C-alpha cells in the first residue's frame, strides 16, 4: 500500500517538475536572446553572457530549486559573493532588477 501511495505521489509531481523545467528553459532562452544588457556587479554583459552565468548558478543551486520562482531567486537576482542585485537594461528603458524582469516574463509565459 505504501509503495502505491509513493508511486502516486511521485506521478502527481511529474507534471509540476516538467512545467518548472520548461519555464526555466524559457527564461534562460529569454535572457540569452534579449537585446537587453545584463548588469552584474556593476559590469555590463550581453544576454548570452548573462544566461551562461545564470546557468552556472542554476547548476550549483539545483538541489535547492523546487519552483521557477526559486530558480529566479537563487540563480538570477543577486551575487552570492557580494550581495549586489543584478539588473537588466533594455534599450530606451530604465534599468530594472533582474528578478522583477524575469517574474514579469514568467507571468506572460504562464498566461499563454
Task: Annotate each predicted stretch with a short phrase.
Residues 4-14:
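Sec-dependent N-terminal signal peptides
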Residues 18-57:
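N-terminal secretory signal peptides
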Residues 42-112:
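Compact alpha-helical subdomains of small soluble proteins
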